[in-house]
């Protein structure tokens, strides 16, 4: 005999916004593989400099910023977006606040990474370690990050539980810092 406390498939369980979460998770894997592959290529160039084939955008100096930005911002950024969006929905027991804005954060971040992939090997940088991207890309990063903060903190604002889980405090601090 079934217990009445078991939730049936037709009960009013919250339906979460997982499309954006899956997109960020998939891209984190893709960017992780690509970023680390570029790292292997530039490591090999330290031993065999001729691996750049005489093409300027394949030189160590052009590929190293691409590698660091791909691993830090593409892989790490997508992993942060995916995990924070997943966790905030489940700990607050609500869908993401402003669903279309959450989709903008995904496509905006993909555009940021695409712009970095094009501009860094071409040598368009600000020549600042870990802040190489040109100012138009910086503006897009800012727009995406502000949208991210709105979605994340908006989701916390409409939560159905009284307390805020500690994981959300850490994600919130990371977003603000």
Predicted regions and their residues:
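Short, intrinsically disordered terminal tails adjacent to the first/last structured region
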Residues: 1-10
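Hydrophobic cores of alpha-helical transmembrane segments in multi-pass integral membrane proteins
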Residues: 2-3, 22-124, 135-157, 167-177
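Cytosolic juxtamembrane amphipathic/interface segments immediately preceding
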Residues: 9-23
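Hydrophobic, small-residue-rich membrane helices and short re-entrant helix-turn-helix hairpins
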Residues: 16-19, 160-166
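Extended, aromatic/histidine-rich regions of cofactor-dependent oxidoreductases associated
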Residues: 127-131
